[in-house]
Amino acid sequence: IETNVIVGRSITIDELMEDGYKAVFVGSGAGLPRFLNIPGENHLGVYSANEFLTRVNLMKGYKFPECPTPVKVGKKVAVVGAGNVAMDAARTAKRLGAEEVYIVYRRSEEEAPARLEELHHAKEEGIIFKFLNNPAAIKADENGWVSSMEVIKQELGEPDASGRRSP
């Protein structure tokens, strides 16, 4: 058994089979977080969805401030993206007491990569969708905590390599 292998970089599936393995299990999980490289993404209160969900689910980060790795959920929360992990993060923030939770996505609902059930459940829980908006900057208050997000309104163009229309 070989674990923690980056298939495609450190070894290929064909190479594993040539080495005598009879089967290959690929567990991709949520993958590595992607940041936007916009001003303000290092302000206090900005988390990758993976970090946010890990702190909440595995480290009891919702027990703010008792937890050694707490997560402070504000009254208003913005989650960037519209995949399954984004839906999980948005719904979790809502359940932890955020009054308004926004999904900010640069494409339209039709291009959202989340499963339809995930979108449906997020809407049922009161998540607010801001489609065709792309984050441009994250602003902070005088203490360094996130206070707002600037977005740029988008229009869809031609489909990209994924088949979804690009902003």
Residue locations for each model-derived region?
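A Rossmann-like FAD-binding core segment of flavoenzymes
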Residues: 1-15, 19-34, 60-67, 95-167
